[in-house]
């Protein structure tokens, strides 16, 4: 169970804040189910292309991603989250990521669970499986060989503290 995060933009919060300020009292606003569905939009369509290279021994050396996410009629797709997560769990020295926020003649898109991340992760993990198979390395071992760990620099700059990626993969053995 659980809501797993909000599914729509917060339209009520600013209205409640203004009403509370004007009245001097707390204000609670609740949408019914119909209003909640009408205030959101569809999840964004996406096109994800991932290329990865590794040595014959299985060490990832380079990766490239092209991410195009539909935003609907106005900019605002979750392509930024996709770009941050596409190679986040791997230690790859050479990375290029192109992310496009595409406006199209459709309703605005909105967030659902892990907006932007799942699309990118699926592209990466599919390629990782294919690469491991081509190299004759068991996929879990391939992931362990290349897992991000403390000190790994993510493609968009931050250096990881201890994140537990290796420990999770080892527990899966």
For each feature predicted by the language model, list its residue ranges.
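Structural alpha/beta core scaffold segments of enzyme domains
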Residues: 1-173
